Amino acid sequence: MISDYEGPTPTKKFDQDILFDYSEGEKEFTFELLDSYISSVEEHLPELLNSFEAKDLKGAVLHSHDIKGSSSYIGCEAVRYVSGKIEAYCKNDELEKAESFYPELKKEVEEVFKILSDFKKNWDKNHGEGGSDDGGDDNESEPTENNNNDGSSVNNNDSSSGGGGKDIENKNTDENTGKNLNERSKSPVPLQTTLKPVTIETPKTASDKIATETPTSLANNTNSSSNNNSKNENGLNSKQPQTSSNSPTKIQTK
């Protein structure tokens, strides 16, 4: 509404100081944000003038609104106020009244652009290009070291290995021999292929004992039987059992 812009234009160009918040390491105003604002105003300011010349009320509303919105986003109070006044008069079908504030808007924009340009130049001068506090590359980091279990340190930023700047060498050596325990032996250890013969003893059964005994006892039994038969022939009273030739011979084992 027009009543919102009846007062004088604010003398303060921004509603806050343009600065960087170092405590949190984050920028309140990034260069990208400032460049985006400048590009937006540089685009819409000439288009607003063209709309005035073409008596394009709708176009004037559009471009003045865009300038006001981007100025409000970064707290550019003076430009926001003048562009908002132009938008309000355009919406009220007062194109000529709105056009009368264009020179003031252009003046405020030029002053703001100068402030932003000086701000960036001073930043580059004091802190170096790229926005880092030490003037160096933000992506460049100090070499870091890791400690191994044996107390030795490892440089993780050694670029000699070509592996992304992290050549980690673990020096684990034997205290007595000084040999690196991580190195594999170049001569492979042969596998043990010669096996010692193993003798397995199994218990013998009764039949095994019979099979392995010498026939001496059997021979003695045979001789004893012959003697008994001869005694029977001589008239002795002892009798020998008659066995069939087909019946198996029984052998008593004790």
Swiss-Prot record:
Residues 131-143 have a biased composition (Acidic residues). Pfam families: Hpt (PF01627). Disruption phenotype: Final morphogenesis aberrant, rapid development (body formation accelerated), premature spore maturation and elevated levels of cAMP. PkaR and rdeA double mutants are rapidly developing and sporogenous. acaA and rdeA double mutant forms only a very small number of spores and no cAMP synthesis. The phosphorelay mechanism involves the sequential transfer of a phosphate group from 'Asp-212' of pde2 to His-65 of rdeA. In vitro, dephosphorylated by dokA. The keyword Manganese does not apply. Residues 239-254 have a biased composition (Polar residues). Keywords: Cytoplasm, Phosphoprotein. One of its GO terms (cellular component) is nucleus. This is Phosphorelay intermediate protein rdeA. Residues 26-123 form the HPt domain. The gene is rdeA. InterPro entries: AHP1-5/YPD1, HPT_dom_sf, Sig_transdc_His_kin_Hpt_dom. PROSITE patterns: HPT (PS50894). One of its GO terms (molecular function) is histidine phosphotransfer kinase activity. Residues 146-160, 220-238 have a biased composition (Low complexity). It comes from Dictyostelium discoideum. Phosphorelay protein that supplies phosphate to regA or accepts phosphate from regA; depending on the relative concentration of the phosphodonor proteins. In vitro, acts as a substrate for cheA (bacterial kinase). Plays a role in the development. ypd1 (yeast) can complement rdeA defect. Residues 124-254 are annotated as: Disordered. The modification Phosphohistidine is found at residue 65. Residues 166-186 have a biased composition (Basic and acidic residues). It is found in: Cytoplasm. One of its GO terms (biological process) is positive regulation of chemotaxis to cAMP by DIF-2.
